[in-house]
């Protein structure tokens, strides 16, 4: 971790505190471009928006993919108060962001707050492989 990383992680934690102060879940994130400037920042708004996907990491990944050119996205770092959940990690991966730096790991979170970690939803499959793959053949991401 560099001194710049530490500064930006502290900002992510401050955004998490601001989110908590507003009655939202205490998570905050920001994007820092290749030149070291803050490009965007956000905090959790799940309760205010009535949107279970309104995590700051998810919102910022969508913003980056929509608003920035590919070269800038790939050279941009996301700083976040907690390690992104699987939903947000998927969005970050798809957005093309180049790096994520987090303060609290998912393991640390689960150890400290075990009751708040929901059990996984059972998933079944794979089924109907030939039909499913026929739709995907030839599709380029």
Predicted regions and their residues:
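Small-residue (primarily alanine) positions within well-ordered alpha-helices
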Residues: 12, 16-19, 29, 40, ...
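Short beta-strand scaffold segments in enzyme catalytic cores
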Residues: 27-36
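Short beta->alpha transition motifs characteristic of CBS
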Residues: 39-46
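A short, polar/acidic, helix/strand-boundary loop motif
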Residues: 2, 46-47
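Zinc-dependent deaminase
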Residues: 1-22, 84, 90-141
């Amino acid at each position: 971790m560099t001194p710049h990383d530490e500064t930006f992680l502290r900002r992510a934690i401050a955004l998490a505190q601001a989110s908590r102060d507003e009655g939202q879940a205490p998570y905050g994130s920001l994007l820092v471009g290749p030149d070291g400037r803050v490009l965007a920042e956000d905090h959790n708004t799940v309760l205010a928006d009535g949107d279970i996907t309104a995590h700051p990491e998810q919102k910022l990944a969508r913003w980056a993919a929509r608003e920035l050119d590919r070269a800038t996205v790939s050279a941009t770092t996301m700083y976040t108060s907690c390690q992104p959940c699987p939903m947000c990690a998927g969005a970050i991966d798809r957005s093309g962001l180049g790096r994520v730096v987090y303060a609290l790991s998912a393991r640390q979170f689960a150890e400290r707050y075990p009751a708040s970690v929901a059990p996984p939803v059972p998933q079944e499959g794979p089924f109907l492989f030939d039909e499913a793959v026929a739709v995907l053949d030839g599709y380029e991401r």
